[in-house]
Amino acid sequence: MKRQHLHVAVGLCSLVIAGCAVHRETRPVRIMPAGRLVVAPDSSTRFLTISAALDSARDGDTVFVMPGEYREAVKVVESRRITLLGADPATTIIDATDQYSAIELRTDSNRVSGLTLRNADSHGIWVRDGQQFIDHCVIANNGDRGVYLSSFAGFAYAHITHCTVVENGEVGIHAARDDSNTVITDCIVAFNPRGIVTDQPQGMLIVRHNCLFGNGLDYDRVTPDNSNILQDPRFADRANGDYRLRRGSPCIGAGSTAANIGTF
């Protein structure tokens, strides 16, 4: 950035102060680039908790979460666009036991990626408002919904891609509004009482290249296209929470870009 100098010469400032001259130099304004804040549970970084890093984050920052288990409820509610990026969804875990939700999102254009979100009393991810981006997450064993796009606080939408949404108490993915701004692609939604749900059956949700299996009801008021499959994803060890795909899984190479359906 070029240094700019502001020279202001003021003559005859007042009848009291005659011949007064003012010379000021303004320093260039530095526009700081978006940064990366690192969280680790072993005191090897500045931040021990995700919430502490988010408190220090600015618009456009990435909060990178090292492997470990984080027992907290995470809220991204300020007017900042944040990327919350886990190192590995198999080993980077937010355990929200006794918390309402593992992650709460408000405002536009936040991204959540590479995490396991589990054991919340209600929702794994609660989108209260705005357009959000959720990818490569395992969302499991939450008391109510895996992902809830609410309509109480405003308009909540999301692009949900390459997620594994399993064994939640009521619903895998619940979109209160049936709107084409919500896109669900390349996800496994399995072993929930209801799989993908909307409250406004207008046929607008985009639901493509997903695998649904073992839900009490796969679709509730949702109109999928024929790119979705209803087959056992063949998890490596479901009983122990290993949702990687075994050899021969119908999800291998079956995604929209010939990648795997699901997180792994």
Positions of PLM-derived features:
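Right-handed parallel beta-helix
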Residues: 109-174
